[in-house]
């Protein structure tokens, strides 16, 4: 189903062939090493457009699923990125999965890294996130 974000502990081995796995933190950090001036505050930096460009360049278009990991970098305040919108752009064309990492699902619509720091969260509209692992 499109326009949903699935959260799972791991992708079943039999589904790996359909998946394009993207370590977001690693991909963006590698691009930063190669193009540090793009990220400078003095430049007109559009994180939404630029990060999509980076990720689109590595997506294998024969795949039907994208598995995102290591999303913390997207929460950097300097980027001012609308993370739900960013991820949902991919959910238009692919099944999007987020591997459950160091975060919790709170209230059914928030991925929260630290309960005590509410700014460390990604908040979706209700009904967008679906947990595939019952806890």
Region spans (language model):
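Extended, compositionally biased accessory segments flanking or bridging domains
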Residues: 1-60, 108-116, 122, 129-135
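Aromatic-enriched hydrophobic runs in primary sequence
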Residues: 9-17, 22, 66-69, 84, ...
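Amphipathic alpha-helical interface surfaces
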Residues: 47-54, 67-70, 83
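Conserved P-loop NTPase "ATPase switch" module shared by AAA+ and STAND
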Residues: 58-79
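Residue-level preference for the first positions of well-ordered beta-strands
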Residues: 2-5, 65-67, 95-97
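Structural motif
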Residues: 6-11, 25, 69-76, 99-102
């Amino acid at each position: 189903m499109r326009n949903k974000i699935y959260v799972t502990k791991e992708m079943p081995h039999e589904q790996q062939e359909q998946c394009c796995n993207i370590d977001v933190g690693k991909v963006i950090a590698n691009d930063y090493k190669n193009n540090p001036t793009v990220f400078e505050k003095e430049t007109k930096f559009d994180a939404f457009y630029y990060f999509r460009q980076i990720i689109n360049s590595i997506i294998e278009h024969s795949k039907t699923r994208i598995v995102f990991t290591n999303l913390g970098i997207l929460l950097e305040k300097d980027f001012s990125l609308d993370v739900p919108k960013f991820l949902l752009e991919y959910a238009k064309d692919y099944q999007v999965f987020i591997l459950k990492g160091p975060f919790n699902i709170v209230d059914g619509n928030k991925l929260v890294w630290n309960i005590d720091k509410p700014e460390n969260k990604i908040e979706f509209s209700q009904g967008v996130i679906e947990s595939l692992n019952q806890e």
